[in-house]
C-alpha cells in the first residue's frame, strides 16, 4: 500500500525522524485555518500518489493564510497524471541550504534491503541514476540487522557527505531504517532530505510503501487505506480474504491456486481472440478453500462487476475435492439468489472429479454449463461473453 505524503510524514514523526509541521486539509477553509495555526510561510502541497506535482502546479508557496486558501482552491480537484487531488497538506516552510536523497527498499534479487543515498537530492532519482550513477551510493543492508549506526556511517561515507554533515545525517538514517523495519515497509524514500540554514537535518518530502502481506501485524495500517481511490470490488474481496485483482475484460475468472488462475487468464485471452476479442475480467484465487461461503463471496464480487458477461470457474481438486467445490457452487447460487444472472462455465478436474460433475448435473441449474477441459471451458465462457455484449 502506497501512502500519501502526509501519512508518510506522520509515520516519520512517530519514529522520531525530524519533520516540519504539516496539516492535511480537504477544503480551502481548512487550508487557511491550517496556515494560520502553523504560522509564517507555508507550502500547499497536493496529496497524490504520483510524482511531478510541482511541474503540474500542485505545489505552491503561500506567504499568508489567504494565499494558502487561494492555492488550495486551485489545487483541490486538480488532475495530476490521472489522479484527482482530494486533499492538500499545509506544510511549514523551510530554510533550505542543501538537498540530499535517501531511500531504503526491498532488493528481492539479493534477498536483502538496499539503501541508496546521494548528496544531490531534489531531482528525479531515476534521472540522477542514469546521468550520474557515481553520485548515487548503493549499500546492501542485512534484514537481520537493519540500518545500525555503523551501517548509516557506511552509507554517508559512500555518499561523500562532509564530516560535519555526516554526523547529523547518521541518526536520521537510523530512524528512517527503523520506520522501514518496524512498519514492515517495502520502500521508505526521502527526497529531499534537507539541511537548513541552521544546520538542522529534516525529512521534507517522504514516500512510504507498506507490505500488505504484513497487515496482520499492523491493524492500525487499515486506517491508512485511501477509500476515495480504492476499487469497491477489490475492497469487498479483501474483506472476504479473497485474492482479487480487477482487469478490463468481460469473462470473470475463479480458480484455486495462483498458477492455475494465471494459466486460465492466458487461455481465456487466447479463446477470446475468436469471440469478439473478449478478455479476462479479473484474477480471483480462492486458494484451498472452496466452501459455499467462499464461492458465494467470490461470485458476489465478480457478478458485481458490470463489465462481466460470463464467469469461468476452473478448479483442480486436491486437498479440496471436486465434490466439495461443486456443492459450494450450487449452494453459492442458492445464497446469491436473484443477484446471480450471468452464465457460469465450470471445469472441474482432479480429486473426486466424477462426483463433482455428477453434483452439477443433478443440480441442473440454468446458469451452469460444464466443460471437461480448460480449453473447452475457456472457449465456452468467451463465446457466452461475446454473445452477451
Curated annotation (Swiss-Prot):
Top EC class for this record: ligase
Catalytic activity: succinate + ATP + CoA = succinyl-CoA + ADP + phosphate; GTP + succinate + CoA = succinyl-CoA + GDP + phosphate
Cross-referenced InterPro entries: ATP-grasp, ATP-grasp_succ-CoA_synth-type, ATP_grasp_subdomain_1, Succ-CoA_synthase_bsu_CS, SUCC_ACL_C, Succ_CoA_ligase-like_bsu, Succinyl-CoA_synth-like
UniProt pathway: Carbohydrate metabolism; tricarboxylic acid cycle; succinate from succinyl-CoA (ligase route): step 1/1
Binding site for Mg(2+): 191, 205
Residues of the signal peptide: none
Cofactor(s) of this protein: Mg(2+)
Residues given in the record as substrate binding sites: 256, 318-320
UniProt superkingdom: Bacteria
Cofactor binding: number and manner: Binds 1 Mg(2+) ion per subunit.
Example GO BP: succinyl-CoA metabolic process
A GO-annotated cellular component: cytosol
Binding site for ATP: 45, 52-54, 94, 99
Record keywords: ATP-binding, Ligase, Magnesium, Metal-binding, Nucleotide-binding, Tricarboxylic acid cycle
Gene Ontology MF, one: succinate-CoA ligase (GDP-forming) activity
Enzyme nomenclature, EC number: 6.2.1.5
Domain ATP-grasp residue range list: 9-236
Subunit details: Heterotetramer of two alpha and two beta subunits.
Function (record text): Succinyl-CoA synthetase functions in the citric acid cycle (TCA), coupling the hydrolysis of succinyl-CoA to the synthesis of either ATP or GTP and thus represents the only step of substrate-level phosphorylation in the TCA. The beta subunit provides nucleotide specificity of the enzyme and binds the substrate succinate, while the binding sites for coenzyme A and phosphate are found in the alpha subunit.
Family: Belongs to the succinate/malate CoA ligase beta subunit family.
Name of the protein this chain belongs to: Succinate--CoA ligase [ADP-forming] subunit beta
Organism: Kocuria rhizophila (strain ATCC 9341 / DSM 348 / NBRC 103217 / DC2201)
Amino acid at each position: 500500500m502506497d501512502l500519501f505524503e502526509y501519512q508518510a510524514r506522520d509515520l516519520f514523526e512517530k519514529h522520531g525522524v525530524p519533520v516540519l509541521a504539516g496539516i492535511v486539509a480537504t477544503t480551502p477553509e481548512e487550508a487557511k485555518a491550517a496556515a494560520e495555526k502553523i504560522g509564517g510561510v507555508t507550502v500547499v502541497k497536493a496529496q497524490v500518489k504520483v510524482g511531478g506535482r510541482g511541474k503540474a502546479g500542485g505545489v505552491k508557496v503561500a506567504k499568508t493564510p489567504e494565499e494558502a486558501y487561494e492555492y488550495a482552491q486551485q489545487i483541490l480537484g486538480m488532475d495530476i497524471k490521472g489522479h484527482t487531488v482530494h486533499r492538500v497538506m499545509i506544510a511549514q516552510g523551510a530554510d533550505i541550504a542543501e538537498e540530499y536523497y535517501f531511500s531504503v527498499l526491498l532488493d528481492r534479487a539479493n534477498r536483502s534491503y538496499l539503501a541508496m543515498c546521494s548528496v544531490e537530492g531534489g531531482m528525479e532519482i531515476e534521472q540522477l541514476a542514469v546521468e550520474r550513477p557515481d553520485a548515487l551510493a548503493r549499500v546492501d543492508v542485512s534484514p537481520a540487522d537493519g540500518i545500525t549506526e555503523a551501517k548509516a556511517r557506511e552509507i554517508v561515507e559512500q555518499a561523500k557527505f562532509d564530516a560535519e554533515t555526516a554526523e547529523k545525517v547518521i541518526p536520521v538514517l537510523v530512524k528512517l531504517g527503523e520506520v522501514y523495519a518496524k512498519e514492515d515497509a517495502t520502500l521508505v524514500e526521502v527526497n529531499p532530505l534537507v539541511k537548513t540554514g541552521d544546520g538542522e537535518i529534516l525529512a521534507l518530502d517522504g514516500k512510504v510503501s507498506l507490505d500488505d502481506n504484513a497487515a496482520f501485524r499492523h491493524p492500525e495500517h487499515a486506517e491508512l487505506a485511501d477509500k476515495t481511490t480504492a476499487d469497491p470490488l477489490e475492497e469487498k474481496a479483501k474483506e472476504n480474504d479473497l485474492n482479487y485483482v480487477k482487469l478490463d475484460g468481460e469473462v470473470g475468472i475463479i480458480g484455486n491456486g495462483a498458477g492455475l488462475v494465471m494459466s486460465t487468464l492466458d487461455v481465456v485471452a487466447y479463446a477470446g481472440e475468436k469471440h469478439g476479442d473478449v478478455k479476462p475480467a479479473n484474477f480471483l484465487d480462492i486458494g484451498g478453500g472452496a466452501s459455499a461461503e467462499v464461492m458465494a463471496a467470490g461470485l458476489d464480487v465478480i457478478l458485481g462487476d458490470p463489465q462481466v458477461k460470463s464467469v469461468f470457474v476452473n478448479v483442480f481438486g486436491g486437498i479440496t475435492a471436486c465434490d466439495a467445490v461443486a456443492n459450494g457452487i450450487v449452494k453459492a447460487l442458492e445464497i446469491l439468489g436473484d443477484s446471480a444472472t450471468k452464465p457460469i462455465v465450470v471445469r472441474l478436474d482432479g480429486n473426486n472429479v466424477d462426483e463433482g460433475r455428477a453434483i452439477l448435473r443433478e443440480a441442473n441449474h440454468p446458469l451452469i454449463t460444464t466443460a471437461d477441459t480448460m480449453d473447452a471451458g475457456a472457449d465456452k465462457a468467451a463465446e457466452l461473453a461475446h454473445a452477451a455484449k
